[in-house]
């Protein structure tokens, strides 16, 4: 691999602009710092604050761990290759290991975002089932399943099934995309695109579900039933109680008055709690959809370039487009902390109180007198 890096395209190395190298190193260093520090702060917050020990934040913690792995291990090797003039100075085995970790992180994020979209739909459409079944152990089982599937997708190229190699134009070790007639990586790309499409379809179904529940339906009045001025039935109102208290009713208490005073307040409180939980679940779903949207937007240009290499025969991919697409895929590892803080009010509040130790209202001091 080292011989391949130095021998083949020595003229290309001389044409690399120092300004382009400086911009690559600066931007990649910033991505590494933000990806490691930002995701580490979010992870510490999720572990330290017990109010965040819930199903969606377990999945968010797993996403942060995957981004930390990619930022701390894979990106420094890219930084070194750019610094050495787009050359790989390590061995073939190291290249395969780094490529394996990068592809593992990519597929893990895609699989996890799909599982999160399914749980978000269950949280809103089937909330009772969601609260009973999605416990800590269920989330742990989902996380282990996602990592297992990701390893199954990323490990075959290590055995030269869809070969990993150093791609000079991308400054990284990854899939070597050849023409579709002699290609081994097309199946991996098709599966990744299918996962992203399925995730968008689940969120689309969730949007339709919420929209249908928000439609204003006409009120249908059902007449109340009365035999002795004690109205009861589906259309009964509070007038039955007034009639009965005024003495118009004879006989036993009507059915609509049994237990109303004892249960009305509890029912009202329970309904308000459900509405509050529904709003919280909607905010969390919005945050995860923004994360999914940014993942698709930042990885989309690179996927287009990969499909271009496989199917296009004529023109070569422009170098500027390929560099921008690769660096956008790198930037995906550092955007999640910003999305979490700016789109989730609960995380923002916990971040200020737990990590920054800022509180809006201080505890009152004990009274004292001056003698």
UniProtKB/Swiss-Prot annotation:
It comes from the Eukaryota. It is a multi-pass membrane protein. Pfam families: 7tm_1. Glycans are attached at residues 3, 84, 183. Residues 48-58, 118-138, 211-287, 343-371 are cytoplasmic. Gene3D superfamilies: Rhodopsin 7-helix transmembrane proteins. The chain crosses the membrane at residues 27-47, 59-79, 97-117, 139-159, 190-210, 288-308, 322-342. PROSITE patterns: G_PROTEIN_RECEP_F1_2. It is found in: Cell membrane. Disulfide bonds join 95-173. Belongs to the G-protein coupled receptor 1 family. This is Probable G protein-coupled receptor 85. The gene is gpr85.
